[in-house]
Structures are given as structure tokens and as C-alpha cells.
Amino acid sequence: MKKYKRGANVKIRRKHPVRVNHLGSDPIPQLVRRLALPAMLAQFVNVLYSIIDRMYIGNIADVGDIALAGVGICGPIVTMISAFAAWIGNGGAPLLSIKSGEQNKEGASAILANCFVLLIGMAVCLTIGAYLCKDALLVWFGATERIFPYAETYMRIYLIGTVFAVLSLGLNQFIICQGFSNLGMVSVIIGAILNILLDPLFIFVLHMGVRGAAVATVLSQAASCAFSLYILFRGPVPVKITFRGYSLPVCRDVLTLGLTPFLIILFDNVLIIVQNVMLKNYGGADSDMLLTCNTIVQSFMLIITMPLSGISGGTQSVLGYNYGAGDTARIRLAEKHILKTALLFCTIMFVFAQWDVSAGIFVGLFTQNAAYRSMTVHFIHIYTLSVIPLAVQYALVDGLTGMSLVCASLPLSFFRKGIYIALAVFLPIRFGAPAMFYAEPLSDVVAAVVTTIVFVTVVPGLLRKREALLGKHIKK
């Protein structure tokens, strides 16, 4: 990785009443908690963007169930936009943390400046490309003749706000990685609350239906984007957006490190596409019903995976900063507490998912059709059987990414996705469309075992090499 010129120590003037997390000196248990909880809550609130849309859409008179399936078909395109934001945000944020740990403010500033330009460029390209290809993509992603009009209507309006979505998601990582996880949470909450207020107004009061849901989402993302820009231009963060230090090597480093989270989300996209295609092709007369049920199941999984990614991603700055400083002891202790937090959260969500009452209440938010509700609750029970092992996968793989150890994190991520795709294709062919829902728990168990083995055998050696590079000795 390119060596940037060392700068002055990164300091914060206490002009603002905002809690500052000192990544290199605060006690690890409290530090992990202060970073993980706001990031987890922020991601949980972020889930409301899609869940609130789908909840209101599912309750539109007469057409709610089909319209809900249409919005679900749009999921891969929405996720693709998020993937590009994550490519830059999750690629640049760990590098900024590492440079801050090295007390290299000039290098950190150059990283943020280049990432800002990359985010804007990607947003423009995505908007143009998605508009040109949206109809073909929606059909390819599984839209039937009845579902397509609702999917196309939602997508046509949603794409107008691509730049807001990319900037709000990508820039938020640079707020969190500087120790201001509370402000990162506020950025997400602003958009979510606005979305909650605007959805019923546009959908029901103004009778805009699916169009109203898309308009509400665009306006909400614009509000989150504006807040993130304010914080990174004029807020209390030590490293702000500047318009200097542009460098192709910096962009290369960001894109290389961010490739892991980008491909992870992109492969999640492939999983959703495979799910929809298999349900459409092997669901027979029930294909529309199965697609609607799957949309609700995936919405439920978002309330697990998004907060879980908040825990593992929000604490990457602790690992990145101390990796930059060469403090192996703090890295080990931090990873231990991150894993404990992730396991606790997933255990709670497992109980919630397996309890008929709680799962039934969730499904009831989307549909009042008894047949849809019964089938969806059953699929939620199946899909979440291995939620607890999923915590191991997220905590360890994201931890490796936070320390810039892409050589280990990328293969582990691909391994889980590959198993899932193979099972999602094989199970419906062999046992029928509903069997596809077993692909998730089976792949989660296998991936968690393999990831744990790789982590405990490979990571200690990589950390020793890092300490040797910095001229330090391992503290036993």
C-alpha cells in the first residue's frame, strides 16, 4: 500500500458537545459498546427505509400483495446501489482509521478527498446505467407480467435519488470511523423518521400508491445526505472533506480494500436474484405468492443482518486504528468483545424469529391475507435457524476487512456466498421451490465453522508480521 507523508497528530478541539471516542486509549469494552450500539441502532433504523415502504405498500387496497412483490423485485437494484456506496465507504474508512492511528493527518485527509470524488462519480454512472437497463433487469430479476408495472414505477422514481443514496451511505462511514458513531446514527435516523412521516402522506393521503413510496424514500435520503455533508464539511470531525490531495494510488488503495464489502453485497444481490428466479420457475401457480412471501422474509432478515453489520462494521475503526498503531493486544481484546456483542444480538433475534407470536406480528405488518401470513411465518422459522452462527461470520470477516487483511476476508466471504447459491439452485430442483429457504441456514453453519478455523490459524501470524514491520515486539 502506498506510503503517505506523515503529518501532525490528529486532534479535536472541543468546540462541540459531542462525545469523542479515543480509539487508541479508551478501555476496549466501553469503546466497543459506544461504537457498536449507535452503529447497530443506526442500521436498525436504516432498515425502516425498506420495511416502512413495504409495510405501507402491502396494505394498499386490492393490489397490496402484488405491489409488495413488485417492490421486492426492485431489491437487487437498490442493493446494487448500496454495494457501490459500500465499495468506497468501507474501502476508505478503514484506511482513514489506519492513517489516524499512524498520526498521519495528511494521508487521512487525502483518503477522504478522493473517496468523496469517487462517490459522486459512481452515483452519476449508476443513475445513467440503471435508467438504461432497468426494464430488462426487472424481468431478469424475476418480475412476472402482473408484478412488472409496480416494480417499474417504483424503480423509475427511486433512481432519481441515486446520488443522495450513494453519498449518504458512503459518507456515513467516514463519520463513524473517526469515532463519531452517534452522529452517524443521527444521519440515518433523520432520513428514517422523515420516511415514516412521508410514506402514509404520499401513499394514502395523496393517493400516489407505489409512486408515493418511492418519492418519500428519495426525499428522506436527500435529508440524510445533507446532514452527512454538513458534518464532514463543517462538523466536529478531525478529518474533513477537502479539495486537494487527489491521487490515483489513493483511489487504487480504496478500491482494493473496498472490494471485499462491495463483492459481499453484490453477491447478496445475486442471492436475491437466484431466489426470485427459482421461486418464479419452480413455484408453479404459487409463484407470485412465494415471491411475496420471500419479500417479507428478506425484510425480516434485514432487521437481523443490518444491525449485525452495524456491530461488526461500526467497530472496524477500533481494529483499524490499533492495527495502524501496531497494538496487537488491543486488537485481540476488541475482536473478543465485538464477537460477544454480535453473538448476544443474534441470540436475541433467533428467539424473536422462532417465536410464532413475534414473527406473526411482523408478517401482519405487510399483509392481512391469512394464507400469506401462515406461509411466511413458516419460512421465517426455516430461514433463521442458523442466525447465531451468522454472528461469527460477520464479526470475524468484517474484523479482517477493518484491519485491511483482504487476503483473508475476501475468500471467506466468497465461500459462504458460493455455498448458498449452490444450495439455492439445487434444493428447489430436487425438493421443490419451498426447499430453497433451507439454503440460508445450511450455508451459515458451514461458513461459520470454516471462518473460525481460518481466523484462529491465520490471523495471529498476520498480526505478528505487522508488529515486526513497525519494529515492535509481541506483548505476551
What are these regions (language model features)?
Residues 39, 43, 55, 94, ...:
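Transmembrane alpha-helix boundary and packing residues in multipass membrane permease domains
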Residues 1-38, 96-161, 207-259, 319-386, ...:
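Short alpha-helical transmembrane segments in multi-pass integral membrane proteins
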Residues 34-53, 157, 191, 220-224, ...:
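Transmembrane helical elements of multi-pass membrane transporters/channels
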Residues 41, 45, 49, 81-85, ...:
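Residue-level hotspots within pore-lining transmembrane alpha-helices
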Residues 44, 48-69, 138-145, 201-208, ...:
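Helix-terminus/linker motif at the lipid-water interface of multi-pass membrane proteins
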Residues 89, 158-176, 187-192, 213-228, ...:
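Short runs within selected transmembrane alpha-helices of multi-pass transporters and secretion channels
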Residues 68-128, 165-184, 291-355, 390-412:
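Small-residue-rich hydrophobic transmembrane alpha-helices
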